[in-house]
Swiss-Prot record:
GO terms for biological process: modification-dependent protein catabolic process; proteasomal protein catabolic process; protein pupylation. InterPro entries: Pup_ligase, Pup_ligase/deamidase. Belongs to the Pup ligase/Pup deamidase family. Pup-conjugating enzyme subfamily. One of its GO terms (molecular function) is ligase activity, forming carbon-nitrogen bonds. The keyword Transit peptide does not apply. This is Pup--protein ligase. The gene is pafA.
Length: 452
């Protein structure tokens, strides 16, 4: 499948402080954040004009699920648009607090762990054909996903009883299964719950919940681009060496703690391979596969960065990627800070900097400041992100959903939507079922809109 439907779901950490002390509980902050949403949507679970879903997840975490996208830059743009949507809610909520005489600053973090050790996720969704053998997909994909933190981890300072250590991944410490139907209780790498949000006879949805939330656009593009390409190669029958892991959960932690990528992890049958070995195998297959594939500049960009990052890890010279990979950007920032102020990695100020990197408020968040200084690469523009806040992807089913929502809101009509249904809540209860996520034009939807 060379054209694939993809989406990213991001849960955000939330807190409210006043002069450095916690002001409100996460539940209370969430209520202020979503008050504007509830006022127009009559719910804290809504779909937006850009086709995305915005809702309050378990544990008072605001969650933004992008609309269906069919190319990488489009997906990165809509992922960033989610930050803008949440930032607008943050500003509105702070104003409400001020109006009620409650001083405080609200923070939304696009990260994966809080100070209490709780974890919240960034989930990737990839449409795959139903006819494929799912067990083979998961078998081949699992070693890739366990080791890809080398190329797309967000980075984290982990405080251990002995010392503080810099790790590749925020999520790695919180994954407890390889493949499972659970998402919260056991946190698998691949979730097998079968909810295709499409024609179930043709498709299923691969739900990957092991990834970190990325701030850097090029890292997000690398994360989803490499996963989609590996899926495409599996579907095309490309042979891969067997890197079945003896214990994926132990391996994911070992990889996260090794910035060199050289520490051996145990494979099934007593063999060993390093994370770098495993990533090199997938990368070399991708380079060969591109020679036979229809040209695609976005995929070529992804494979180029993939190779450069693996070279950087191997040589431990990150100069050629130090604006493109989250964990590399963050580690360089920490090292500069430590050198300037003569402090250890365990210093609380480094932990504060770690958190501030993921603050989504422009002008305050550390990543935003780095990006403005040209120290973090861009693949989209502020104008494109602003447009994506209100405009759905124009090449997928999201266009139909977004147009229906806009028309119904402007006509003052009561409606209900989900990923596949568009419904007018009138006497006729007219409903259109949109089972094809690739379809952006539908006469039935046009007629439904015209009838308003």
């Amino acid at each position: 499948m060379q054209r694939r439907i993809m989406g990213i779901e991001t849960e955000f950490g939330v807190t409210c402080t006043f002069h450095g002390h916690r002001r409100l509980s996460p539940d209370e902050v969430a209520r202020y954040l979503f008050r504007r949403v509830v006022s127009w949507g009559r719910s804290s679970n809504v779909f937006l004009r850009n086709g995305a879903r915005l809702y309050l997840d378990v544990g008072s975490h605001p969650e933004y699920a992008t609309a269906e996208c069919d190319n990488l830059i489009q997906l990165v743009t809509h992922d960033r648009a989610g930050e803008r949507v949440l930032e607008d809610l943050l500003i509105d909520a702070e104003q409400r607090l001020a109006d009620e005489g409650i001083g405080g600053d609200i923070y939304l973090f696009k990260n994966n762990t809080d100070s209490a050790g709780n974890s919240y996720g960034c989930h990737e969704n990839y449409l795959i054909v139903r006819a494929g053998e799912f067990s083979r997909i998961s078998d081949v994909l699992l070693p890739f996903l366990v080791t890809r933190q080398l190329i797309c981890g967000a980075g984290k300072v982990l405080q251990t009883p002995k010392a503080a250590t810099f790790c590749l991944s925020q999520r790695a410490e919180h994954i407890w299964e390889g493949v499972s139907s659970a998402t919260t209780r056991s946190r698998p790498i691949i979730n097998t719950r079968d909810e295709p949000h499409a024609d179930a006879e043709k498709y299923r949805r691969l739900h990957v919940i092991v990834g970190d939330s990325n701030m850097c656009e090029s890292t997000t593009m690398l994360k989803v681009g490499t996963a989609s390409l590996v899926l495409e190669m599996i579907e095309a029958g490309v042979p891969f060496r067997d890197f079945s892991l003896d214990n994926p959960i132990r391996a994911i932690r070992e990889v996260s703690h090794d910035l060199t990528g050289r520490r051996p992890v145990r494979l099934a049958g007593g063999r060993q391979a390093s994370a770098l070995d495993i990533q090199r195998e997938y990368y070399s297959r991708a380079v060969d596969y591109l020679q036979t594939r229809e040209p695609n500049s976005q995929i070529e960009q992804v494979v180029d960065l993939w190779g450069r990052q693996l070279d950087a890890v191997e040589s431990q010279d990150f100069a050629k990627v130090d604006t493109e990979i989250d964990w590399v950007i963050k580690r360089k920032l920490f090292q500069r800070y430590q050198d300037r102020y003569n402090m250890e990695l365990s210093d609380p100020k480094i932990s504060q900097l770690d958190l501030a990197y993921h603050d989504i408020k422009r002008g305050r968040g550390v990543f935003d400041l780095l990006q403005r200084k040209g120290l973090a690469a861009r693949i989209t523009t502020d104008e494109e992100i602003d447009a994506a806040v209100d405009t759905p992807p124009q090449t997928t089913r999201a266009k139909l959903r977004g147009e229906f929502i806009s028309a119904a809101q402007e006509a003052g009509r009561d409606f209900t939507v989900d990923w596949v249904h568009l419904k007018l809540n009138d006497q006729a209860q007219r409903t259109v079922l949109c089972k094809d996520p690739f379809r952006s034009v539908d006469e039935r939807v046009k007629r439904l809109i015209a009838s308003m």
